[in-house]
Amino acid sequence: MKLLIQRVSAARVEVEGEVVGGIDQGLLALVGIEPQDDQASLTRALHKLLNYRVFSDEAGKMNRSLTDVQGGLLLVSQFTLAADTKSGMRPSFSSAAPPAQGEALFDALVEAARARHPQVATGRFGANMQVHLVNDGPVTFLLEV
């Protein structure tokens, strides 16, 4: 599972002009699910999302987690993160999970996140989405679990 996380001061997802999910301060996580991902991957991913220290403390050091700052978490499924880009001039998506598996694991991630964190929003799986964000920093990390 690949997670592209961005520290944001605000973010929202629109589908066909309608806002389907949004947060204020927090993390936007683009989630790429791969065929080998399972419940253990999901558990590790959620632990990282909630506890990875990317928010500044009083000294300006990245020492606070999403849980510490009680920020929002916006989860957006993005199968293109799992693309194979090593050869040629066109990405291959054979390394991404099949849609049914991807949707099941993404839904399970959302459900687990909502059980452990008070502010969770999402995009819409499989939809053509417009993601709007204000990257704070900018701070962006690619996590692989």
UniProtKB/Swiss-Prot annotation:
GO molecular function: D-tyrosyl-tRNA(Tyr) deacylase activity; Gly-tRNA(Ala) deacylase activity; Ser(Gly)-tRNA(Ala) hydrolase activity; tRNA binding
Protein keywords: Cytoplasm, Hydrolase, RNA-binding, tRNA-binding
Protein name: D-aminoacyl-tRNA deacylase
Higher taxonomy: Bacteria, Pseudomonadati, Pseudomonadota, Gammaproteobacteria, Pseudomonadales
Gene3D superfamilies the UniProt entry points to: D-tyrosyl-tRNA(Tyr) deacylase
Location relative to the cell: Cytoplasm
Organism from which the protein derives: Ectopseudomonas mendocina (strain ymp)
Alphabetized Pfam families for the sequence: Tyr_Deacylase
Function: An aminoacyl-tRNA editing enzyme that deacylates mischarged D-aminoacyl-tRNAs. Also deacylates mischarged glycyl-tRNA(Ala), protecting cells against glycine mischarging by AlaRS. Acts via tRNA-based rather than protein-based catalysis; rejects L-amino acids rather than detecting D-amino acids in the active site. By recycling D-aminoacyl-tRNA to D-amino acids and free tRNA molecules, this enzyme counteracts the toxicity associated with the formation of D-aminoacyl-tRNA entities in vivo and helps enforce protein L-homochirality.
